[in-house]
């Protein structure tokens, strides 16, 4: 099958298609993880994005449902240098997702690094004419920026779900903005009961569950669009312990009156170094975000707890008095290092400060 990747600046790359025969639009981003393509594709934070892997060979070890981070593929499309197994091709076909291979991903990665993420179109078909490519380029240019699309409603649970454990020592209400399953697993493994609720659940409904703490999950898109969620978080501050991961860190910062901004190409990979400003320890972390918190916008009673050692951006915040903290990186990994798994223990300990 033929395949073409069309960028809004007019760049056109032709390659070989795999997966579903269709066309999709989205923001083209890259991730530097060397393994974990199943976890990447099923991560809800990639909704609205076409994901490119910088590692050249994908599919080497097949596909297993145990590796899923949601109920299926959430990325809009997949860009790789070379696919090495039919399992990955079948996986994309099962979830109606197109992929392109046999293109210069190093060129594309450098382009995004230098110019920033771009709107793009990926099409896979038996034949693709020049006229079709010209028409798709015009559609790419008109396509909405990711900041103008409501993505969280597409990946959040529709109904509350209870994840029980045999001997619960804490209860967490998880505001699901597109949660990765390993976040839930990591809490349940620590004997924490998790009540997963839709992203727009009202604060008074959350409190009816009598949580020991509230966790705001990761998810896709621009945090500033989630005004209803931010309002609910504001009403929870000072009432119940709160923590957050990735998008949750941004939403908590906005609830405190801070600001967020879109990064040039974001942090997506499994080797991002962060520094704990309290202990001065450095951890290698898994990350997947295209927005960040503006440090100087945070109020005096909120301090930065972690920074990224590559670009000095905010990687976590902590309230100076209240039992509230959040991190921009992913302590649950999947894929990536487990260096900061201890933060789930810190989350559960928040109940002792109620």
Swiss-Prot record:
It is an enzyme of class 6 (ligase). Residues 171-354 form the Glutamine amidotransferase type-1 domain. Pathway: Amino-acid biosynthesis; L-arginine biosynthesis; carbamoyl phosphate from bicarbonate: step 1/1; Pyrimidine metabolism; UMP biosynthesis via de novo pathway; (S)-dihydroorotate from bicarbonate: step 1/3. One of its GO terms (biological process) is L-arginine biosynthetic process. It holds the Pfam family GATase. Its EC number is 6.3.5.5. The keyword RNA-binding does not apply. L-glutamine binds at residues 45, 219, 221, 247, 250, 288, 290-291. PROSITE patterns: GATASE_TYPE_1. Residues 1-167 are annotated as: CPSase. It catalyses: hydrogencarbonate + L-glutamine + 2 ATP + H2O = carbamoyl phosphate + L-glutamate + 2 ADP + phosphate + 2 H(+). Keywords: Amino-acid biosynthesis, Arginine biosynthesis, ATP-binding, Glutamine amidotransferase, Ligase, Nucleotide-binding, Pyrimidine biosynthesis. The active site is at 246 (nucleophile), 330, 332. GO terms for cellular component: carbamoyl-phosphate synthase complex; cytoplasm. InterPro entries: Anth_synth/Amidotransfase, CarbamoylP_synth_ssu, CarbamoylP_synth_ssu_N, CarbP_synth_ssu_N_sf, Class_I_gatase-like, CPSase_GATase1, GATASE. NCBIfam families: CPSaseIIsmall, PRK12838.1. Composed of two chains; the small (or glutamine) chain promotes the hydrolysis of glutamine to ammonia, which is used by the large (or ammonia) chain to synthesize carbamoyl phosphate. Tetramer of heterodimers (alpha,beta)4. Small subunit of the glutamine-dependent carbamoyl phosphate synthetase (CPSase). CPSase catalyzes the formation of carbamoyl phosphate from the ammonia moiety of glutamine, carbonate, and phosphate donated by ATP, constituting the first step of 2 biosynthetic pathways, one leading to arginine and/or urea and the other to pyrimidine nucleotides. The small subunit (glutamine amidotransferase) binds and cleaves glutamine to supply the large subunit with the substrate ammonia. Belongs to the CarA family. This is Carbamoyl phosphate synthase small chain. It comes from Methanocaldococcus jannaschii (strain ATCC 43067 / DSM 2661 / JAL-1 / JCM 10045 / NBRC 100440) (Methanococcus jannaschii). The lineage of its organism: Archaea, Methanobacteriati, Methanobacteriota, Methanomada group, Methanococci. The gene is carA.
């Amino acid at each position: 099958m033929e395949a073409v990747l069309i960028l809004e600046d007019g760049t056109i790359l032709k390659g070989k298609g795999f997966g579903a025969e269709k066309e999709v639009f989205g923001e083209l981003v890259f991730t530097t993880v060397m393994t974990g393509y199943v976890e990447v594709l099923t991560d809800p934070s990639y909704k609205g994005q076409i994901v490119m892997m910088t590692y050249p060979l994908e599919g080497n070890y097949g596909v297993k449902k145990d590796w899923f981070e949601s109920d299926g593929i959430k990325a809009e499309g997949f860009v790789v240098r070379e696919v090495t197994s039919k399992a990955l091709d079948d996986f994309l076909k099962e979830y109606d997702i197109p992929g392109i291979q046999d293109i210069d991903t190093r060129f594309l990665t450098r382009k995004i690094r230098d110019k920033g993420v771009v709107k793009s179109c990926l099409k896979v078909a038996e034949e693709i004419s020049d006229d079709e490519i010209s028409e798709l380029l015009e559609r790419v240019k008109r396509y909405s920026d990711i900041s103008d699309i409501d993505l969280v409603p597409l990946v959040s649970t529709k109904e509350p779900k209870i994840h029980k454990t045999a001997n619960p020592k804490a209860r967490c209400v998880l505001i699901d903005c597109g949660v990765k399953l390993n976040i839930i697993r990591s809490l349940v493994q620590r004997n924490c009961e998790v009540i997963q609720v839709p992203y727009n659940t009202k604060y008074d409904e959350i409190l009816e569950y009598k949580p020991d703490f509230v966790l705001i999950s990761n998810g896709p898109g621009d945090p500033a669009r989630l005004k209803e969620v931010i309002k609910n978080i504001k009403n929870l501050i000072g009432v119940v312990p709160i923590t957050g991961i990735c998008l949750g860190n941004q939403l908590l910062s906005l609830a405190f009156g801070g600001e967020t901004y879109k990064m040039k190409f974001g942090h997506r990979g499994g080797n991002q170094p962060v520094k704990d400003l309290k202990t001065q320890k450095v951890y290698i972390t898994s990350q997947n975000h295209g927005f960040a918190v503006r440090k100087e916008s945070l109020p005096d009673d909120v301090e930065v707890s972690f920074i990224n050692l590559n670009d000095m951006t905010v990687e976590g915040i902590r309230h100076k008095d209240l039992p509230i903290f959040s991190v921009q990186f992913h302590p649950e990994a999947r894929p990536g290092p487990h260096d900061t798994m201890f933060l789930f223990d810190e989350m559960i300990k928040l109940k002792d400060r109620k």
